[in-house]
Amino acid sequence: AMGGDPLPNKEGGQLWLQNAGFIWVPFIIASSLLAWFGMNDIADAKASFAEQSVIFQRKHNWLMCWLYTGTFGSFIGFSAGLPLLAKNQFPDVDVLKYVFLAPLVGAISRAATGWVSDKFGGARVTFWVFIGMMIGTLGVIHFLQAGNFTGFLAMFIFMFFVTGVGNASTFQMIPVIMRSEVPRLMPQLAGAEATRQAEKESAAIVGFTSAIAAYGAFFIPKAF
């Protein structure tokens, strides 16, 4: 079998659990083929690395990296760390039956709450997201010390929910910020040119902040 040595199971047999990941290979291949043959590139959205590298000079690029690490980084880090923490602290509970609910809620809340940022503003929503995360963290600590798994899981589900809201709100902030910053930083650009430049920088910042925030999957489980 591919993927390494087998693991023993309870019945005394062998299990190649690591091979379960190969179930995604056909879907990845199909998606890649559909993208290659079916998607159309937008010509005016192309930008070289040199053109995109201007974002490293933008203060708000680094600020958004920090904020998005707090939201998406927390989401992906909690997804990796929650089962480990729950299993260590509540060994008598079959945590795998329940912990999947938290990331599911976070994923749904990201998709379902984007309108909130559009209506009230991404910055305002992000502020309250971090307040909610602080409240959720205190709740987790409280129920962890009390040995209450139900309360512990409920607080984590709440934190996943607000991180999902924050994932949407921080991304909503990026184009808004750049549409304001580019005309100020590059006054020589006319209206349409400034808009295109803001769109290019926004797209680059979205990609870069996502890459940085993904490190949450590494350092949050390490904290446990």
Region spans (language model):
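Cytoplasmic membrane-interface "Motif A"-like loop-to-helix N-cap segments
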Residues: 118-131
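Juxtamembrane intracellular "pre-TM" segments in multi-pass secondary transporters
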Residues: 40-65
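Extracytoplasmic gate region of multi-pass secondary transporters
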Residues: 58-107, 167, 171-172, 220-221
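A late C-terminal transmembrane helix in Major Facilitator Superfamily
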Residues: 188-224
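Hydrophobic core of transmembrane alpha-helices in multi-pass small-molecule transporters
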Residues: 150-167
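C-terminal ends and interior cores of transmembrane alpha-helices
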Residues: 131-147
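Intracellular juxtamembrane helix-capping segments at the cytosolic ends
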Residues: 165-193
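C-terminal membrane-cytosol helix-exit motif in multi-pass small-molecule transporters
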Residues: 24-45
